Amino acid sequence: MKKKLIAFVCFLLVSLSGLPQLPVRLNERPVVLNTSTGALKGKMVTPNQESGYPVVLIIPGSGLTDMDGNSAALPGKNNSLRYLAEGLAGKGIASLRYDKRGIASSASAGKDEYSMRFEDGIKDARGWIDYLSKDKRISGIYVLGHSEGALVGMAASVDNPKVKGYISVAGAGRPAYEIIEEQLSLIHISEP
């Protein structure tokens, strides 16, 4: 009888292991960072626990890329950064992703295009790091940048004692001017 019970429990466990897992409940809330030119808006996703979790600041790439990883210059949506945030939360890691100044929900914080500088992005990332450092639920801050966001994140993280780690996703491996020239050559502008 005991062997049959053990066999049944083993069978049950093996059978249940093949079932899809229930989705993790995410806690997502809007966040705002006030700057001298206006409000930068983002979303913070936290795992389903009270405190003691690390957070990843997710910095989007170049151009018209929003906090979810979608570019207004490209057709469709991939939501890559949103999916990343959800996946991190499922592993007990919080994240904060934001729209850069002049983009999507942070459009009003943008200066005119000719006045914007790379340093503005670094200053904004540092502002978000300071924002996160005041949250007592967080056990450590990590910065993740995608594409141009990797350069911004690296500059914002260097010599910053508030940052425990830095992650570059598809960061530049060659001089920025080469990348910009290449990207501009791929843009097809039709003449009227």
Residue ranges and their predicted role:
Residues 185-192:
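Residue-level detector of conserved catalytic or cofactor/ligand-binding positions
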Residues 79-107:
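Conserved alpha/beta-hydrolase
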Residues 131-183:
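Primarily recognizes the serine-hydrolase "nucleophile elbow" in alpha/beta-hydrolase
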Residues 21-51:
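N-terminal cap/lid segment of alpha/beta-hydrolase-fold proteins
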